Curated annotation (Swiss-Prot):
Keyword RNA-binding: yes
Feature: compositional bias, Low complexity: 70-93
Protein name (Swiss-Prot/TrEMBL): RNA-binding protein Hfq
PANTHER family: RNA-BINDING PROTEIN HFQ
Keyword set, alphabetical order: RNA-binding, Stress response
């Protein structure tokens, strides 16, 4: 497994396995919503009313509708997606409050 995918694969697999609804933002700003049906090194199969094959190089952000626990082979990595994201959100909120 490629080093760059040691976080990506467990995260996507947890979303797929738990059937978590996700919003996928593309680099051109388009927002796609659905559940991850499958994925490989290059694409994600997103299912809603239809199935869409989305190329990973076109994806900017994957946002789960709820926190997802996943395991990573990355030492020191976060085991909870929202755990590391919460800090950034709190810092952003604190900065907004200070203005």
């Amino acid at each position: 497994m490629a080093k760059g995918q040691s976080l990506q694969d467990p995260f996507l697999n947890a979303l797929r396995r738990e059937r978590v609804p996700v919003s996928i933002y593309l680099v051109n700003g388009i927002k796609l919503q659905g559940q991850i049906e499958s994925f490989d090194q290059f694409v994600i199969l997103l299912k809603n009313t239809v199935s869409q094959m989305v190329y990973k190089h076109a994806i900017s952000t994957v946002v789960p509708s709820r926190p997802v626990s996943h395991h990573s082979n990355n030492p020191g990595g976060s085991n909870n997606y929202h755990g590391s994201n919460t800090t950034a959100q709190q810092q952003s909120q604190d900065a907004d409050d200070a203005e």
